[in-house]
Structures are given as C-alpha cells and as structure tokens.
C-alpha cells in the first residue's frame, strides 16, 4: 500500500514515529523559511510542516509547486506540537505527487467559498470532498448497516427482487418504460408484489434495500425519481400493529446507532439526535383531518395530505408518529380493508416528512381479485402475482421506508439531493 496510516491515526502519542500518508492537498502556506501543507483524507486533516533546515531541499522546493486538490504521498516523522492543529504535525522527508489537479476548480472543496446546490451537484466529485458530505455518507453507511443488523437479528432474510417488470406494481402511470427486446417493460416502482409472492413461497420474513423508480414530475426538495427503499414483508401477523412495531423499533435502533458511532460526523453537521421513545403515537386519518382543520388547513376526506399539511403536522408532533386507517380510495389494491371506508394502511411521519408507508395486505384470493377490479385494473395483468394466492397465502404485511428521507431527518439536510451521491430528478441525469 502507498500509505500505512490515515490522518486520524496521526496523534501526539505517536511522537517520533515514521508514517506514510496519502491524500489531497487541502491548503498550502508558504512563509519563506517554513512551509505548511494541509493534507486531507477521508478521516480528516493533518498539518505537514517543512522547516527549511529540517527537510531535504528537493522536498522543500516541491511545496510551492503543489496545486490544491492534487493527490500526494508523504513519508515523514510524527511530531507532537501544541501549536499545530490537533496538537500534532508531520515533518516530511519525501513528498510524491501521484496526480496533479487542475488549478481551475469549479468549486472550493475547503468550503470557504459558497456555491449553490446546482453548481455543487454539477461538480459532485469535488463537492463530496467537503467535510459535510463526507459526514453525511459515513452516517448513511452506519444507517444501512444498522438496518441490516436489526432485521437479521429478527429473522429477516435479505432478498433482491427484479427491477425490470412487465406491469405496474400499483396500477399507476408513474412508470419509466425501458427497451426490452420485442416487449414492453418498465423500471420497478417498488418490490411490493414480489415481497408478497415470497410470503407464499414460505420465506416468512424478508427485507430488501434497493432502488425504486418513479416517473413523478415533482421537482421538490423531498422527491427523487430514483431512490433507495427499505422494504420488509412478514407472515403470520395478527394485524398491521405487528409490522408497525418492527418499524418504530428499527428507527429507534438506527438513531441510537448513529448517536453511538457518528459523534464526529454529527458534530460536523451541527446535529444532536434525540433518543426516540417507542411506541410512537398513533392517530387515525380522520383524527388527522380534524387536527389540521383546527389549525386552519382543510383536507377533503379521501385526499392525500398536501405538503402544507405535512409541515404543520411536523410542527405539532416533535416525535415520529403514525397516521392510521387511511381511506380505501387512497391505497393500492393489495391493502386489506377494515370496513367499507378505511384500511389497515399507515404512514410514518417525522419532521414534516412521510418516511414510510405500510399495511396488512389482503391475503384472500377472491377479495384481492375484487379489489383489483374495483380500482379499474385487469386481474389478467397480475396473473403471475395472483397465482401465488391460490396455493396457501398466510396473513402478512409490511412497509417501505424511504432511506433518503430518513437520512434527511438524521442529518438535517434540507434537500433530499444532499443525502444522495448522484441524484436523479426530472432535470438531472448527470453526472
């Protein structure tokens, strides 16, 4: 390896040790008889100090030629110094330029010069070098790891369902068509139908962390056309409460893990995460409309909640909460109904965002066919899905959790694009 340590490994306790470091030139300061280079890698920044009398002439003379963001390799000696950042510096004996950067940068990775979001996304690779994006994506890694650990401990099996499908998952029109030889095909909106088929296959508990694609024309701070969804499905449930408990306990676990493992990253983002207490509060859809009406926002029965309503609910409820018993007309055909008006469906809300949706599913073949027809769809279009219900389908339910929206609540990002490496929205297909 070209390096044997990260910058974070360089501590005063290693005074006198030889190290090999590699990273990016963050800053260069030339004071004549002494020169400084700030070397950055994914763990932080360390100061390279070059007194003219203590380093080789070749190394000393190389510093003024270094351009910001060039990639360099350094061999030197750790030296404790209370005046240096972090109380430590490295005295280089050798500096090797591995890759020289252009002097004209489309944005400043040090963050000293502000840039708008579009500029940052256009130069995303440089933008991702900044401290805040680095913190966000380290947190994202901890979040997905925590999700997997939580679900695996509870007997869930990770699966990967098709992303090229022949028909709409939910009968909607928000589909991206793809060229698939001589047939029509689409990108999957969700793994929903396949999760249910796996319940019939006897898997009992499955989860997937994977992409979903929705051809929505929304161009807001909370919408993407390609996103990552965390989905589960579980068999032999008594009611939707069984899957709601898994969801609330998972979210509390994720927040706890991020607090424990991402102290430095949260500090970089100026965030303090609360300890989520379970169970979360539950209010029905009808109660939600009444509450909104009390605050001057009128929503007709059977309508989805507009953004204004979600924001107001985020002001009323400081903690995550569930909205339950959604009207039948607002939910897909596979949702189990409680009566002629409402269903077992629920949404998880937090900070004015809908984070997750779920329900107990309809497992009875004849009822499912009827509900497909009632929504103006053809059972023939779902024949392979329906086939699974003919040979013994257990009562089951599940949910889908938006990973990016969850990360918005954790990191404080105001725009969903901030928590996505290379976002895809209505106007952005590059980089």
UniProtKB/Swiss-Prot annotation:
Pfam families found in the cross-reference section: tRNA-synt_2 (PF00152), tRNA_anti-codon (PF01336)
GO cellular component, as recorded: aminoacyl-tRNA synthetase multienzyme complex; cytosol
Listed GO MF terms: aspartate-tRNA ligase activity; aspartate-tRNA(Asn) ligase activity; ATP binding; magnesium ion binding; RNA binding
Binding site for L-aspartate: 170, 214, 357, 361
Primary location class: cytoplasm
Catalytic activity: tRNA(Asx) + L-aspartate + ATP = L-aspartyl-tRNA(Asx) + AMP + diphosphate
Swiss-Prot/TrEMBL cofactor(s): Mg(2+)
Its biological purpose: Aspartyl-tRNA synthetase with relaxed tRNA specificity since it is able to aspartylate not only its cognate tRNA(Asp) but also tRNA(Asn). Reaction proceeds in two steps: L-aspartate is first activated by ATP to form Asp-AMP and then transferred to the acceptor end of tRNA(Asp/Asn).
Protein name: Aspartate--tRNA(Asp/Asn) ligase
Origin species: Methanopyrus kandleri (strain AV19 / DSM 6324 / JCM 9639 / NBRC 100938)
